[in-house]
């Protein structure tokens, strides 16, 4: 296994246009960490993974795996194993032959090949499927074979490029568990790309949040940290809105009172909200944006909250264990997630409490103010 270091890495597909895809990417990935690259389409997450694999050139900057600079090292010599979105199995070969193939090309002896393949099959639960061809396997089984083909190479770093996106919802959940167990079994360095932030939150030791690069931006690496760090303390509105499901609600307003650990915001709706936020770097009258997660909102009859607002119900979804209510709050979409059924119908007015400890606040440049408390819903 190995650590991975990226220093001032940049990617530009067309230097004549002076438009970078990735800029000033600086990351240090520890040996054995599970790192997830996440972001919307066009943010460069798969490009960054392919640069680590050696499938894309690095325009500027330095990539190290262990203590060796890899910029000009061919993919086959980088010590990485890659699993793609497509399974890419040989249809005329059975499971065992697919897993053996790469080792045979590298001229490993028969005993080594058999030992590695049998070990990978045991880890992945493929023992009973070794004589089957890909057409006789389910999607999840095919993906396990693709992972097994990488395991037998014993790479220093595993690279996963959206490996679950071709699977249905139930199978994605099952395979997430399998990949998490695999990481614990191998204690390996894994770099994993996904557009699904739920996958990122459930699998990662740390998450890299990337955004589509703005021309004037220094970098499109928005934040690098643990899942809970990104959830509770996002550095900006982009990260706050991307991490968490359903997405965070945002409402515009202005600061009307600033204290050491709290502030008051008058929303454009006219409601005044108290937030446990240190806003002392701003001034009274500054325009801000309040953020509140759907799961932190509670109908006022269940919440003794001084801060509250109301909206008109557009849709109510009752799922048994939880409910989602979609409100129109002064023309803005607003989502409430509750742990039980909320007795409302389309067209009703619903008033919700906003706990001060649950508030996030962002300035006019969308940078987050420091939160001074963490909300614990009881």
Predicted feature residues:
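Conserved ABC transporter NBD signature motif
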Residues: 61-69
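Helix-to-loop junction immediately C-terminal to a conserved catalytic motif
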Residues: 53
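ABC ATPase nucleotide-binding domain
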Residues: 5, 28, 64, 351-353
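Conserved coupling/switch loops of ABC nucleotide-binding domains, chiefly the family-specific signature
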Residues: 59-62, 112, 252
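Glycine/charge-rich catalytic "coupling/switch" loops of P-loop NTPases
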Residues: 262-315, 333, 343-378
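A short, flexible loop at the N-terminus of ABC-type nucleotide-binding domains that lies
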Residues: 1-6, 12-24, 73-74, 107
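ABC ATPase nucleotide-binding domains
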Residues: 78-79, 85-236
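The feature captures the beta-strand-to-loop junction immediately N-terminal to the Walker
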Residues: 38-40
């Amino acid at each position: 296994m190995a650590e991975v270091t990226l220093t001032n890495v940049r990617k530009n597909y067309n230097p004549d246009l002076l438009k970078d895809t990735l800029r000033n990417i600086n990351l240090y990935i520890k040996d054995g960490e599970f790192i997830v690259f996440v972001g919307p389409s066009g943010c460069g997450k798969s490009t960054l993974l392919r640069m680590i694999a050696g499938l894309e050139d690095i325009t500027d900057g330095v990539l190290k795996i262990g203590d060796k600079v890899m910029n000009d090292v061919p993919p086959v010599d980088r010590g990485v194993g890659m699993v793609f979105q497509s399974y890419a199995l040989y249809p005329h070969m059975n499971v065992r032959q697919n897993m053996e193939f790469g080792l045979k090309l590298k001229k490993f002896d028969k005993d080594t090949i058999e030992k590695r393949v049998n070990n990978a099959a045991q880890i992945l639960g493929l023992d009973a499927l070794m004589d089957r061809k890909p057409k006789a396997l389910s999607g999840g089984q095919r993906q396990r074979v693709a992972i097994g083909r990488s395991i037998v190479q014993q790479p220093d770093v595993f690279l996963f490029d959206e490996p679950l996106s071709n699977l249905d919802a139930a199978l994605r959940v099952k395979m997430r568990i399998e990949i998490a167990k695999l990481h614990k079994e191998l204690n390996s360095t894994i770099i994993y790309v996904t557009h699904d932030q739920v996958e990122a939150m459930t699998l990662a030791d740390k998450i890299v949040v990337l955004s589509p690069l703005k021309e004037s931006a220094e970098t499109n690496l928005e934040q690098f940290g643990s899942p809970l760090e990104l959830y509770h303390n996002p550095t900006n509105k982009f990260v706050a809105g991307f991490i968490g499901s359903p997405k965070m609600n945002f409402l515009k307003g202005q600061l009307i009172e600033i204290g050491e650990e709290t502030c008051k915001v008058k929303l454009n709706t006219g409601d005044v909200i108290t937030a446990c936020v240190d806003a002392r770097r701003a001034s009274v009258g500054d325009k801000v944006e309040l953020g509140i997660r759907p799961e932190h909102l509670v109908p006022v009859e269940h919440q003794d909250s001084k801060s509250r607002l109301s909206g008109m119900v557009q849709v109510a979804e009752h799922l048994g264990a939880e409910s989602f209510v979609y409100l129109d709050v002064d023309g803005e979409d607003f989502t409430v997630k509750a742990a039980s059924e909320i007795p409302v119908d389309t067209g009703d007015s619903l008033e919700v409490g906003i706990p001060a400890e649950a508030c996030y606040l962002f300035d006019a440049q969308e940078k987050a103010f420091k939160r001074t408390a963490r909300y614990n819903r009881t």
